[in-house]
Amino acid sequence: MLFRSAGKTTIARGVEKRLLDEGRRVEILDGDVVRTYLTKDLGYSRADRDENIRRIGFVAHLLSRNGVVVLCSVVSPYRDVRDEMRVLHDGRFFEVYVSTPVDVCSDRDVKGLYAKQKAGDLTGLTGIDDPYEPPVNPELVVPTHTQTLEESVEAVWQALHS
């Protein structure tokens, strides 16, 4: 997943609703919520960002092996850690690259992080002054700047069922 305000959580909620309507057990691991409760001891260094994703991936693994569909709505900037999670999940990893230009994310930003970064009050914003390594071969690319929410949710839904 890419930048903040790209549409990750909104899409995850749409997919979650469909899964619940099917009677499936489902959990969303949202990056902001996880940072509030599970990884609040971590900062935003490379090592801390990697550890954040590893912890989220481990929780997702535990839930998944117990029959829960897990939707991880997180900024995961580094390819090598995403690859580690793919191995951990052994065939149950489905990467959706929410491809949204930074200017669109900035326009959607309700927390004002992009404005703070632009004003010099915030550093380390993924994709701006901290690197983001796009996936090489994700299972699905969702360009939220050219699709409606409904189209994005439908694309994920169809890909999961193919």
What is the predicted function of each stretch?
Residues 99-102, 107-155, 159-162:
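Small-molecule kinase domains that catalyze NTP-dependent phosphoryl transfer to phosphate-bearing small molecules
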Residues 1-2:
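Short, small-residue-biased leader/transition segments that mark boundaries at the very start
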Residues 6-61, 65:
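Conserved substrate/cofactor phosphate-moiety recognition/catalytic segment
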Residues 37-44, 48, 60-118, 124, ...:
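ATP-dependent NMP and nucleoside kinases share a basic, alpha-helical "lid"
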Residues 30, 45-55, 81, 118-124, ...:
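Helical mechanochemical/support elements of P-loop NTPase systems and associated helical scaffolds
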Residues 28, 93-95, 139-141:
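Conserved beta-strand scaffold positions in the cores of enzyme catalytic domains, especially
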